[in-house]
Amino acid sequence: MQPITTASTQATQKDKSSEKKDNYIIKGLFWDPACVIA
């Protein structure tokens, strides 16, 4: 699994809207941004 920092960085670069999805990652759900967006 990729570290949360890397996932958050990639998500931010892809879309600012993904910041909301980062909240789920911060909660403890280690989901990849791509999976969440999909």
UniProtKB/Swiss-Prot annotation:
Stretches for region Disordered: 1-20
Highest taxon, organism lineage: Eukaryota
Alphabetized GO MF terms: mating pheromone activity
UniProt keyword annotations, A-Z: Cell membrane, Lipoprotein, Membrane, Methylation, Pheromone, Prenylation
Record localization: Cell membrane
Residues where Cysteine methyl ester is found: C35
Pfam family, one: MFA1_2
Principal location class: membrane
GO biological process, one term: pheromone-dependent signal transduction involved in conjugation with cellular fusion
Keyword Secreted listed: no
Biased composition (Polar residues): 1-12
Lipidation feature positions (S-farnesyl cysteine): C35
General function of this protein: The active factor is excreted into the culture medium by haploid cells of the A mating type and acts on cells of the opposite mating type (type alpha). It mediates the conjugation process between the two types by inhibiting the initiation of DNA synthesis in type alpha cells and synchronizing them with type A.
Name recorded for this polypeptide: Mating hormone A-factor 2
Organism, as annotated: Saccharomyces cerevisiae (strain ATCC 204508 / S288c) (Baker's yeast)
